[in-house]
């Protein structure tokens, strides 16, 4: 039997590069989902992508926006080879999620849709409002959710323009008109038959950044329902469990902006979230 040459050792197992979780939004709102995902999956690697060159999505014609997102994901998948992709944007999810699944069947996609089912389960008064972009409000998908899960509730859809942009200004530390915010959320608050709205669904991932402002401006206390935690749990459920023997190259979490020129405030924000450009 041949002896191994002196000084030789068994070959080390190959350490695979870690496939990241890709979190996508039109701007910085998806950071609310990333934050919860890191709590649920602290050992995973993330790439955060903001389509700031296309922001805000509410200004787009639907077919043009659909084509844009599908084409962008072709580049993202080729560049990052994600283990899973999260559409951390209600507008994009209700528009293009199924098309993305058909276009890229090898990648699991998780969408962000209005949290109407949990709202219907939690409400005591039966009066629920959904605060969203006009695009999310007008989609048949949103109405189907109401019909399927909240048919016994009175659900008011409130579509607002500009609140996502106000959230971006707020997170940058810029001033904004609180009277405008108050006017936009006012239709969410209904009094009917001696009962009041008790849940407002935040159906845009930007809005949780404003939640303290919303609480202060609201005419009475409500549960502002943020779906980020549920999205994070769904992501984890679709990923294979890791064992203690799994080894991966340690790599930084990344941020990519489609404009390729995020300003100083955004760069600071991304660094605060532990994201490298």
UniProtKB/Swiss-Prot annotation:
Gene3D superfamilies xref list: 3.40.50.1860
Keywords of the record: Cell shape, Cell wall biogenesis/degradation, Isomerase, Peptidoglycan synthesis
GO molecular function terms noted in the UniProt entry: glutamate racemase activity
Enzyme class: isomerase
Binding positions (substrate): 25-26, 57-58, 90-91, 205-206
Pfam family, one: Asp_Glu_race
Catalytic residues in the record: 89 (proton donor/acceptor), 204 (proton donor/acceptor)
Annotated pathway: Cell wall biogenesis; peptidoglycan biosynthesis
Catalytic function, reaction form: L-glutamate = D-glutamate
Keyword Iron found: no
GO process terms (BP): cell wall organization; peptidoglycan biosynthetic process; regulation of cell shape
HAMAP family, per the entry: Glu_racemase
Function: Provides the (R)-glutamate required for cell wall biosynthesis.
Family in the record: Belongs to the aspartate/glutamate racemases family.
Name this polypeptide is given: Glutamate racemase
Organism of provenance: Brucella ovis (strain ATCC 25840 / 63/290 / NCTC 10512)
